[in-house]
């Protein structure tokens, strides 16, 4: 039985997207799919177009899914926050949370690129300030 879960809304320039997780979250094949509604009639099932997978495993990262979207403090960058696995084997013990900047294609669709490996450095968001987060004792 197919599994689709964790829908997240993404809007840009009047376009409406729903990004969702597909497959079992414990598997290497967990990925993100995308629904696009080009005409705004959200209650009409025929108005939605399905695309996917739009963010999926690589040879270093597996089980990519369950995301959220945020903007940088200056509102100029779009970021995706997502889970991934560092091993191919089924299970949840190797699941991590990652953040990555993403772009928009010339077609108006989000372009998430490839998921980052566990140890990949990332540039901080634009106009972010270094912060110290106190750790609980």
Regions found by a protein language model. Give the residues of each.
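Carbohydrate-active catalytic/glycan-binding domains of CAZyme proteins
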Residues: 1-137
């Amino acid at each position: 039985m197919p599994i689709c879960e964790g829908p997240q809304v993404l809007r840009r320039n009047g376009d409406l997207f729903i990004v969702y997780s597909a497959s079992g979250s414990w598997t290497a094949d967990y990925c993100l799919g995308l629904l696009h509604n080009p005409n705004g009639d959200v209650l009409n099932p025929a108005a939605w177009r399905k695309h996917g997978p739009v963010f999926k495993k690589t040879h270093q990262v597996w089980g990519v899914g369950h995301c959220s979207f945020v903007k940088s403090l200056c509102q100029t960058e779009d970021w995706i926050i997502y889970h991934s696995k560092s091993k191919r084997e089924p299970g949840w013990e190797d699941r991590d949370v990652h953040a990555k900047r993403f772009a928009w294609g010339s077609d108006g669709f989000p372009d998430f690129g490839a998921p980052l490996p566990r140890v990949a450095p990332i540039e901080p968001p634009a106009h972010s300030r270094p912060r110290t987060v106190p750790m609980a004792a």
